[in-house]
Amino acid sequence: MSESPYKAGTTHFGFRDVAAKDKQKLVGQVFTSVARNYDLMNDLMSLGVHRAWKRYYVATAQVKPGDRVLDLAGGTGDIAALLKERVGAEGSVVLGDINAGMLSVGRDRLTNRGLVLGLDYVQCNAEALPFLDNSFDLVTIAFGLRNVTDKDAGLREMYRVLKVGGQARVLEFSEVTADWFKPIYDFHSFKILPKLGKLFANDSDSYQYLAESIRKHPPQDELKAMMGQAGFERCHYKNLTGGIVSIHSGYKL
């Protein structure tokens, strides 16, 4: 495994090399730009399949009524809403996001759906979470880890705030496993997606970054190893839709 570019003082922002200290601001600008069209963005990036991926992700999580759950990079709240159904009236979900605009959209959408009790919203950096050790039964992050500057630090923080016996889950765009599909996927990502972003959201640059960020994200086996290095045990992953996305799971034992 190559040395983390973060440790060298630089990291990637899409295909660009930038100072690690600047990535958080740059990513923040992207998500402030796309916050109101975030679900549209995911529809364009996944051709609408992200909704099924998210339902499966939550349905297969280790969570039960009464549990306390942390959903990082919670965005517009769709994962948090599904998790709240699983933990029930006695359970609680904390929706955490570093971006105030995304957090506001999530709060408004869930409130408009009548989802108020047992939901909290915290603006936080995944690399330095403002929670006590052993606070949550389940920690999730969906389509957010690739935007974290120091992914190793983010994984260590997920481990720290997880209760013993708890599970961490990562849903993320990943490395396509079928060679024949890779050229098609690249064409959609780099030729079609930015144009759709320009057409529907008047923002091609943000969509270009998001496509590039997927290619820079660690492939499945590397992310599994990173989770193990962060302290998680029984780490494994499951590819969905030919590896377009994968679900990584690990436990604090």
Swiss-Prot record:
Keywords: Menaquinone biosynthesis, Methyltransferase, S-adenosyl-L-methionine, Transferase, Ubiquinone biosynthesis. Its EC number is 2.1.1.163, 2.1.1.201. CDD domains: AdoMet_MTases. It catalyses: a 2-demethylmenaquinol + S-adenosyl-L-methionine = a menaquinol + S-adenosyl-L-homocysteine + H(+); a 2-methoxy-6-(all-trans-polyprenyl)benzene-1,4-diol + S-adenosyl-L-methionine = a 5-methoxy-2-methyl-3-(all-trans-polyprenyl)benzene-1,4-diol + S-adenosyl-L-homocysteine + H(+). Pathway: Quinol/quinone metabolism; menaquinone biosynthesis; menaquinol from 1,4-dihydroxy-2-naphthoate: step 2/2; Cofactor biosynthesis; ubiquinone biosynthesis. GO terms for biological process: aerobic respiration; menaquinone biosynthetic process; methylation. One of its GO terms (molecular function) is 2-methoxy-6-polyprenyl-1,4-benzoquinol methyltransferase activity. It comes from the Bacteria. S-adenosyl-L-methionine binds at residues 76, 97, 125-126. NCBIfam families: MenG_MenH_UbiE (TIGR01934), PRK00216.1-3 (NF001242), PRK00216.1-5 (NF001244). Methyltransferase required for the conversion of demethylmenaquinol (DMKH2) to menaquinol (MKH2) and the conversion of 2-polyprenyl-6-methoxy-1,4-benzoquinol (DDMQH2) to 2-polyprenyl-3-methyl-6-methoxy-1,4-benzoquinol (DMQH2). Belongs to the class I-like SAM-binding methyltransferase superfamily. MenG/UbiE family. This is Ubiquinone/menaquinone biosynthesis C-methyltransferase UbiE. The lineage of its organism: Bacteria, Pseudomonadati, Pseudomonadota, Gammaproteobacteria, Lysobacterales. The gene is ubiE.
